[in-house]
């Protein structure tokens, strides 16, 4: 679960500013170190998305709650940062209470986006199990859209953080390639 209390956070309110800054820095450093071994696979996903954008495809983010807000911020920055046309990168979010648990709402969001085989759909979900995001990625896969699910879950759960790349064939919708990259972040 993404909503667990971090063991080093028991007394955050009692820490001085310097100790708090050190704690946050240490945790950020652990996250960066955990990602490093998986950079080739992450780069593969980035290249696949970039190829689609260069070929006239679009990038659609799907996220709920804070993950959705982060996806929306990234989508808003893409035109200025990467020079893509406005509207090429879009975020579809579930921000109202309970929407994150609605798989059908995610499927509907993907349908409303008019996803097609030349597009990319990126799900962003802390738990890896957010129904809205999974529903959107299911619909995207059914439409032959390239999908990536970026997620984080703590090491205490059965599911570790991972990036999943599902390459689908526009001809028959079958999954040609699956890459699972285990990334345990934090503690």
Each language-model region and where it sits:
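Cofactor-/ligand-binding subdomain signature composed of acidic, glycine-rich
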Residues: 1-38
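Catalytic, metal-anchored helix/loop core of enzyme active sites in primary metabolism
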Residues: 1-12, 50-53, 62, 70
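Short secondary-structure boundary/capping elements
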Residues: 12-16, 41, 98-105
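Structured helix-beta-strand junction loops
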Residues: 27, 55-56
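A short, well-structured juxtamembrane/interface segment
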Residues: 37-54
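Glycine-rich phosphate-binding loops that contact phosphosugars or nucleotide phosphates
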Residues: 59-180, 184-186
């Amino acid at each position: 679960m993404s909503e667990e209390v971090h063991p080093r956070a028991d007394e955050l309110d009692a820490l001085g500013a310097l100790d708090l800054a050190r704690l946050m820095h240490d945790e950020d450093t652990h996250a960066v170190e955990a990602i490093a071994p998986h950079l080739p696979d992450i780069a593969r996903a980035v290249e696949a998305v970039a190829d689609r954008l260069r070929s006239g495809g679009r990038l659609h983010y799907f996220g709920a709650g804070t993950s959705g807000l982060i996806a929306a911020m990234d989508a808003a920055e893409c035109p200025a940062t990467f020079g893509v046309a406005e509207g090429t990168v879009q975020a579809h979010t579930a921000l109202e209470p309970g929407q994150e648990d609605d798989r059908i709402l995610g499927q509907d969001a993907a349908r409303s986006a008019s996803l097609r085989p030349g597009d990319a759909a990126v799900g962003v979900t802390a738990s890896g199990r957010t129904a809205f995001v999974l529903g959107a990625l299911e619909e995207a896969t059914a439409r032959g859209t390239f999908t990536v699910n970026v997620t984080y879950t703590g090491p205490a759960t059965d599911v570790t953080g991972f990036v999943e790349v599902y390459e689908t064939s526009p001809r028959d919708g079958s999954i040609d390639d699956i890459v699972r990259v285990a990334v345990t972040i934090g503690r």
